[in-house]
Amino acid sequence: MQPSGHRLRDVEHHPLLAENDNYDSSSSSSSEADVADRVWFIRDGCGMICAVMTWLLVAYADFVVTFVMLLPSKDFWYSVVNGVIFNCLAVLALSSHLRTMLTDPGAVPKGNATKEYMESLQLKPGEVIYKCPKCCCIKPERAHHCSICKRCIRKMDHHCPWVNNCVGEKNQRFFVLFTMYIALSSVHALILCGFQFISCVRGQWTECSDFSPPITVILLIFLCLEGLLFFTFTAVMFGTQIHSICNDETEIERLKSEKPTWERRLRWEGMKSVFGGPPSLLWMNPFVGFRFRRLPTRPRKGGPEFSV
């Protein structure tokens, strides 16, 4: 085997390692099953603070839009239509954020680099596999080790503290939706702020809001700054993610300028692979694939067993 000090892209990887890492180690199998039964969550202090801040900032924007701009408006349909649109975008954004944060990004099972498993691969002379010394696993093609998640992640793009998770093979779709819905809601909030300022300047400041004029101005200015910051950040991230998907190249691979040893997908094939299936409105739905886990209930003495 090659020394584990650095990763070589020009080595030949065993084809079995690109699949689901099925191996015969009983201890590793039980460990993988335990991970599958638990909700994926990274216990990182900085990431959890950033995730909570994301929700608080969205809640602040929703408060200003609803209670400062829309409810005091005399135009009923203007308030209803814009309120429904903004709150739908906010719900979709936060749902996408949760799915990104709580979805396994494609972690490689720990401890599968056992002697028995390596012997079962039946490697040919000259074939090379790569073992991660940190989590004691055999790295599949295009997997990278995350020092925060402490796992090797398939097709790892980057670790994002705002979602407290890595963006990888299994949750990249939700991250793309999160950036898109945050960008759209930011644009909508900025447009509403513009209309609100025009309405207040043309009329009376005391009539355009239930709050005092100084408080109204401060709330609107903070919302404008938040909207500009969020839109700039998420629009750039959305563009880079779509570019990476279409080029079948993660951000880590692009920064390292690594020569691809894999067959790159066509642009639409990459999009269909990430979003699951041909183009449809389901691409925009963060709830697709969401399932409640069946939890066994504790049986009563002498009674039958039930599941909910």
Swiss-Prot record:
Cellular component GO terms, alphabetically?
Answer: endoplasmic reticulum; Golgi apparatus; Golgi membrane; nucleoplasm
The residue ranges crossing the membrane are 51-71, 76-96, 174-194, 218-238
Q: Which InterPro entries match?
A: Palmitoyltrfase_DHHC, PFA4/ZDH16/20/ERF2-like
- Which residue intervals are topologically Cytoplasmic? 1-50, 97-173, 239-308
Spell out the post-translational modification annotation for this entry.
Autopalmitoylated.
Enzyme Commission number(s) from the entry: 2.3.1.225, 2.3.1.-
Q: What class of enzyme is it?
A: transferase
In this protein, which residues make up the domain named DHHC? 130-180
Reactions catalysed according to its record = L-cysteinyl-[protein] + hexadecanoyl-CoA = S-hexadecanoyl-L-cysteinyl-[protein] + CoA; L-cysteinyl-[protein] + tetradecanoyl-CoA = S-tetradecanoyl-L-cysteinyl-[protein] + CoA; L-cysteinyl-[protein] + octadecanoyl-CoA = S-octadecanoyl-L-cysteinyl-[protein] + CoA
* Topological relation to the membrane, as annotated: Multi-pass membrane protein
Major location (coarse): Golgi
Task: List the stretches on the Lumenal face of the membrane.
Answer: 72-75, 195-217
Q: Which key words are in the record?
A: Acyltransferase, Golgi apparatus, Lipoprotein, Membrane, Palmitate, Transferase, Transmembrane, Transmembrane helix
- What GO MF terms are annotated? palmitoyltransferase activity; protein-cysteine S-myristoyltransferase activity; protein-cysteine S-palmitoyltransferase activity; protein-cysteine S-stearoyltransferase activity
Q: Which Pfam family is an annotated match for this chain, by its short name?
A: DHHC
> Which residues constitute the catalytic centre?
C160
Compartments reported by the entry: Golgi apparatus membrane
BP GO terms, sorted: androgen receptor signaling pathway; glucose import in response to insulin stimulus; negative regulation of catabolic process; peptidyl-L-cysteine S-palmitoylation; polarized epithelial cell differentiation; positive regulation of D-glucose transmembrane transport; progesterone receptor signaling pathway; protein localization to plasma membrane
Its quaternary organisation is: Homooligomers. Heterooligomers with ZDHHC3.
Its biological purpose is as follows:
Golgi-localized palmitoyltransferase that catalyzes the addition of palmitate onto various protein substrates and therefore functions in several unrelated biological processes. Has no stringent fatty acid selectivity and in addition to palmitate can also transfer onto target proteins myristate from tetradecanoyl-CoA and stearate from octadecanoyl-CoA. Palmitoylates sex steroid hormone receptors, including ESR1, PGR and AR, thereby regulating their targeting to the plasma membrane and their function in rapid intracellular signaling upon binding of sex hormones.
Its domain comment says: The DHHC domain is required for palmitoyltransferase activity.
UniProt lists the family membership as follows: Belongs to the DHHC palmitoyltransferase family.
User: Protein name, please?
Assistant: Palmitoyltransferase ZDHHC7
Q: Which organism is it from?
A: Homo sapiens
